[in-house]
């Protein structure tokens, strides 16, 4: 269904759902992951089909060197997907301890290869010039 309820309880109608990306990763240039207050309940919902699909898509995009963009704890999810080995990630301070493969920084935003991350929504704008360059 395209009518979804986010982990944080927000209901919306999406243009499409993450499940439709599975197996179609080559048709897209990037994934943008918008985080928020949902991370504290991610573990409670990690086994849900939509989160399994999300992690599968993030892993596939990362392994193909496709662009992954996100803020807040997005870097943590990229790390959980196993695609951040040796990469610097700007993540929310509360997510820093969870980063095990990449390197969490205190930077407001950062670009390391195909990973574009910002500490939180206040700093997304600081990486946008770089995002726009690669998406042209």
Segments predicted by a language model, with ranges:
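Extended, subdomain-level signal for the structured scaffold at the beginning of enzyme domains
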Residues: 1-68, 76-88, 96-136
């Amino acid at each position: 269904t395209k009518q979804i309820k986010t982990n944080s309880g927000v209901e919306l109608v999406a243009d499409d759902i993450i499940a439709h990306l599975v197996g179609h990763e080559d048709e897209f240039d990037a994934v943008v992951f918008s985080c928020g207050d949902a991370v504290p309940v991610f573990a409670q919902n990690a086994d849900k089909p939509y989160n399994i699909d999300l992690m599968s898509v993030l892993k596939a995009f990362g392994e193909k060197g496709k662009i992954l963009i996100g803020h807040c704890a997005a870097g943590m999810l990229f790390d959980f997907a196993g695609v951040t080995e040796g990469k610097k990630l700007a993540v929310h301070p509360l997510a820093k301890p969870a980063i095990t493969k990449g390197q969490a920084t205190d930077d407001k935003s950062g670009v390391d290869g195909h990973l574009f991350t910002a500490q939180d929504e206040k700093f997304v704008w600081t990486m946008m010039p770089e995002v726009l360059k690669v998406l042209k």
